[in-house]
């Protein structure tokens, strides 16, 4: 089981946590949503849950709940700039299809 984070994503998450002034790391998860079935969740973590799995890469803790791990194993979290847009990108080897709008995926 593994989760990794790119240099650009690590820098962005670290900056967000520093600006926020608190937080243990970043929670990465999935929820049922959209036309393809699942969507990613990204949120700051202030307290750990009993079923959390912690991965640390490039000085950033990425926390995943046990139920989401099966869908996220092997995922790399990246931060990209494309033209005027910038944001987090999920390089997930488990994805079999994505919806046309890019909001959800299926495994």
UniProtKB/Swiss-Prot annotation:
The keyword Iron applies. GO terms for cellular component: cytosol. Its cofactor is Fe cation. Signal peptide: none annotated. Binds 2 iron ions per dimer. The dimer may bind additional iron ions. InterPro entries: Fe-S_cluster_asmbl/transfer, FeS_biogenesis, FeS_cluster_insertion, FeS_cluster_insertion_CS, HesB-like_dom_sf, IscA_proteobacteria. GO terms for biological process: iron-sulfur cluster assembly. Gene3D superfamilies: HesB-like domain. The keyword Transferase does not apply. Keywords: Iron, Metal-binding. GO terms for molecular function: 2 iron, 2 sulfur cluster binding; iron ion binding. Fe cation binds at residues 35, 99, 101. NCBIfam families: iron-sulfur cluster assembly accessory protein, IscA, PRK09502.1. Belongs to the HesB/IscA family. Is able to transfer iron-sulfur clusters to apo-ferredoxin. Multiple cycles of [2Fe2S] cluster formation and transfer are observed, suggesting that IscA acts catalytically. Recruits intracellular free iron so as to provide iron for the assembly of transient iron-sulfur cluster in IscU in the presence of IscS, L-cysteine and the thioredoxin reductase system TrxA/TrxB. Homodimer; may form tetramers and higher multimers. This is Iron-binding protein IscA. The gene is iscA.
């Amino acid at each position: 089981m593994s989760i990794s984070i790119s240099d650009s994503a690590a820098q962005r998450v670290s900056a967000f946590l520093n600006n926020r002034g608190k937080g243990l790391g970043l929670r990465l998860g999935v929820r049922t949503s959209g036309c393809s079935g699942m969507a990613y969740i990204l949120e700051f973590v202030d307290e750990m849950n009993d079923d959390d799995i912690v991965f640390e890469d490039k000085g950033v803790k990425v926390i995943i709940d046990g139920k989401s791990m099966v869908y996220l194993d092997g995922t790399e979290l990246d931060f990209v700039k494309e033209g005027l847009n910038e944001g987090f990108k999920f390089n997930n080897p488990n994805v079999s299809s994505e919806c046309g709008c890019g909001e959800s995926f299926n495994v």
